[in-house]
UniProtKB/Swiss-Prot annotation:
Domain of life: Bacteria
Active-site residues from the entry: 115
Protein species of origin: Clostridium beijerinckii (strain ATCC 51743 / NCIMB 8052) (Clostridium acetobutylicum)
InterPro entries in the record: Acetoacetate_decarboxylase, Acetoacetate_decarboxylase_bac, ADC_dom_sf
Pfam families named among the record's database cross-references: ADC
Family of the protein in this entry: Belongs to the ADC family.
UniProt protein name: Acetoacetate decarboxylase
Catalyses which reaction(s): acetoacetate + H(+) = acetone + CO2
Signal sequence annotation: none
Keywords: Decarboxylase, Lyase, Schiff base
Length: 246
């Protein structure tokens, strides 16, 4: 391969890249979202400045993605924390677990999604929408919601999906010193809502050293939503460079 061609490649291995080029379009993406109140002091310890806490809430999200351009079919689970940045409301993505290697690789390399390998599932059990997460063989989370009990306003569903996502991008140099340390923002685009529902929900988190979702304990369920949508991942942008701060 010519030297001029090397920099044109998206990632390694060159003969079989870990993921294809985007954009990444999601068809029939299914969300189970549960917003709950948690411990404010616990949130203060993990949300990085200059983000500001909006309230002592966490959004537990489970996403089934059966048809993703270039990445295939997979399921993802994680926690997002409502925040504000320069007056703009969005969600800080705290941790994400999924069962698809290309999606993990592209999320970490091409953006700043805090993705790790896990085993989430989203399914219907009789009249209940169920989301479960395992890390290795151990249970980490179980979420339940009545299946399509009450319609959710489509504008509200759109607003939930369209919120900006804030993430940390941290890469060390070969000398062990920070090479990249940035706050990133990305938004979903080309959103189409196919259906949305709300209803009663419960969430149980189990302590795990390497999947510490339970460190943000469930004190009260605030709301829940079940949303079917198509969307495209937006291009991430840098909003704050920690290494440029004197």
């Amino acid at each position: 391969m010519l030297e001029s061609e090397v920099s044109k490649q998206i990632t390694t291995p060159l003969a079989a890249p870990a993921f294809p080029r985007g954009p990444y379009r999601f068809h029939n993406r299914e969300y189970l979202n549960i917003i709950y109140r948690t411990d404010l002091d616990a949130l203060r310890k993990i949300v990085p400045e200059p983000l500001e806490l909006d309230r002592a809430y966490v959004r537990f999200e489970m996403m089934a993605m059966p048809d993703t351009t270039g990445l295939g079919s997979y399921t993802e689970c994680g926690q997002a924390i409502p925040v504000k940045y320069n007056g703009v409301k969005g969600d800080y993505l705290h941790m994400m677990y999924l069962d698809n290697e290309p999606a993990i690789a592209v999320g970490r390399e091409s953006s700043a999604y805090p993705k790790k390998l896990g085993y989430p599932k989203l399914f219907v059990d009789s009249d209940t929408l169920v989301g479960t997460l395992k890390y290795g063989t151990l249970p980490v989370a179980t979420a339940t919601m009545g299946y399509k009990h009450e319609p959710l306003d489509l504008k509200e569903a759109y607003a939930q999906i369209a919120r900006p996502n804030f993430m940390l991008k941290i890469i060390q140099g070969y000398d062990g010193k920070p090479r990249i340390c940035e706050l990133i923002c990305a938004e979903n685009t080309d959103i189409t809502i196919h259906g949305a529902w709300t209803g009663s929900a419960r969430l149980q988190l189990f302590s795990h050293a390497l999947a510490p979702l339970a460190d943000l304990p469930v004190l009260e369920i605030v709301s829940a939503s079940h949303i079917l949508t198509d969307l495209t991942l937006g291009t991430p942008k840098v909003v704050h460079d920690y290494l440029s701060v004197k």
